[in-house]
């Protein structure tokens, strides 16, 4: 599908695409013009392929944040069936920035948890811009404990700029909620698959991202802090986000090389936002394949391998 919103670096291909559309409207039944349209369409695809195969880290950040990228609820509708949402943390309230519930993947029951952003202003406010409060993480943990009790695999979708930093969130124990999730997820005896679909922002992402397999979409990002936040701390200038993005090494390719993630899931030409259904098909295959492998691993081994997976990410370099 054609994207409604374009990024600055796409401008050359977008301008050509508009001209192709105009020519296609003029062509009508003219076979000669129709042939030219086909040639130009192929040229558009080639241009887009060149652009997206050479994205800088900062450009990748822009793609990861694209407002039309599929969110958790989109993947729930396209990959899973029989989704039943579960609400509340049984302590404070329900956090709309995290969606959680029961679903079926290829007929098999699973638990699905994910950050949820909004597309328009009203929905963005309702979802708190995808930034969970402590009750969101406690809700996620409550649902994960249900998965443990009923021996259901857990699949999480990560897409958040970070945990909500408001005063109320701190008063209700934001840090404790995140830390507890990390500890409890590390010990769960059911398979856990994590998919970073857009932004993987710091502890706010990690609180639902301790898994046996961590996948990243091709143009998603995952880092300890946003580029703008990093720039504000290092140089007291949030506008130096592009420079910070290069230093953070936050792309899927970077993190695969660093062995932080296990698999990069290819996106459709131009990004997941251009074809939700194609992206969902590719991701469905990757999740199903990884889940089949994990189901064959004994629970005790699963927990030990998960622990070792995250333990080896800490490395000291002596200079």
Curated annotation (Swiss-Prot):
Compartment(s): Cytoplasm
Gene Ontology biological process terms, A to Z: fatty acid biosynthetic process; malonyl-CoA biosynthetic process
PROSITE patterns linked to this entry: COA_CT_CTER
Keyword Endoplasmic reticulum belongs to the record: no
One annotated Gene Ontology cellular component of this protein: acetyl-CoA carboxylase complex
Residue ranges occupied by any CoA carboxyltransferase C-terminal domain in the UniProt entry: 39-293
Alphabetized Gene3D superfamilies for the sequence: 2-enoyl-CoA Hydratase, Chain A, domain 1 (3.90.226.10)
E.C. number(s) listed in UniProt: 2.1.3.15
Coiled-coil positions: none
UniProt pathway annotation: Lipid metabolism; malonyl-CoA biosynthesis; malonyl-CoA from acetyl-CoA: step 1/1
Main location: cytoplasm
Short name of any one Pfam family annotated for the protein: ACCA
Keywords: ATP-binding, Cytoplasm, Fatty acid biosynthesis, Fatty acid metabolism, Lipid biosynthesis, Lipid metabolism, Nucleotide-binding, Transferase
UniProt keyword Iron present: no
InterPro entries on file: Acetyl_CoA_COase_a_su, ClpP/crotonase-like_dom_sf, COA_CT_C
GO molecular function per UniProt: acetyl-CoA carboxylase activity; ATP binding; carboxyl- or carbamoyltransferase activity
Catalytic activity: N(6)-carboxybiotinyl-L-lysyl-[protein] + acetyl-CoA = N(6)-biotinyl-L-lysyl-[protein] + malonyl-CoA
Family affiliation: Belongs to the AccA family.
Quaternary structure (record): Acetyl-CoA carboxylase is a heterohexamer composed of biotin carboxyl carrier protein (AccB), biotin carboxylase (AccC) and two subunits each of ACCase subunit alpha (AccA) and ACCase subunit beta (AccD).
Function, in words: Component of the acetyl coenzyme A carboxylase (ACC) complex. First, biotin carboxylase catalyzes the carboxylation of biotin on its carrier protein (BCCP) and then the CO(2) group is transferred by the carboxyltransferase to acetyl-CoA to form malonyl-CoA.
NCBIfam families: accA, AccA_sub, PRK05724.1
Protein name: Acetyl-coenzyme A carboxylase carboxyl transferase subunit alpha
Classification lineage: Bacteria, Pseudomonadati, Thermodesulfobacteriota, Desulfuromonadia, Geobacterales
Encoding gene, per UniProt annotation: accA
């Amino acid at each position: 599908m054609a994207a409604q919103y374009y990024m600055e670096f796409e401008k050359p291909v977008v301008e050509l695409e508009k001209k192709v559309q105009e020519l296609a409207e003029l062509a009508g039944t003219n076979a000669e013009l129709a042939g030219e349209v086909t040639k130009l369409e192929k040229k558009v695809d080639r241009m887009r392929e060149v652009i997206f195969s050479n994205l800088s880290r900062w450009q990748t950040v822009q793609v990861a944040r694209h407002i039309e990228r599929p969110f958790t609820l989109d993947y729930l509708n396209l990959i899973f069936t029989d989704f039943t949402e579960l609400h509340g943390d049984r302590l404070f309230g329900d956090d709309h920035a995290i969606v959680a519930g029961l679903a079926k993947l290829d007929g098999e029951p699973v638990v699905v948890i994910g950050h949820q952003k909004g597309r328009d202003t009203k929905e963005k406010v309702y979802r708190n811009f995808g930034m969970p409060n402590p009750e969101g993480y406690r809700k996620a943990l409550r649902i994960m404990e249900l998965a443990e009790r009923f021996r259901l695999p857990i699949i999480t979708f990560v897409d958040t700029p970070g945990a909500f930093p408001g005063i109320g969130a701190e008063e209700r124990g934001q840090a404790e909620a995140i830390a507890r999730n990390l500890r409890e997820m590390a010990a769960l005896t059911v398979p856990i698959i994590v998919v970073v679909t857009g932004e993987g922002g710091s502890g706010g992402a990690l609180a639902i991202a301790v898994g046996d397999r961590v996948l990243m979409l091709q143009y998603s990002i995952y880092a300890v802090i946003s580029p703008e936040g990093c720039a504000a701390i290092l140089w007291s200038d949030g506008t130096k986000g592009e420079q910070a993005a290069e230093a953070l090494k936050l792309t899927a390719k970077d993190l695969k090389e660093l062995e932080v993630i296990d698999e990069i899931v290819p996106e459709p030409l131009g990004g997941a936002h251009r074809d939700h259904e194609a992206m969902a098909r590719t991701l469905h295959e990757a999740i199903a394949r990884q889940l089949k492998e994990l189901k064959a691993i004994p629970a005790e081994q699963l927990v030990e391998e998960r622990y070792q997976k995250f333990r080896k990410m800490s490395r000291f370099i002596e200079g």
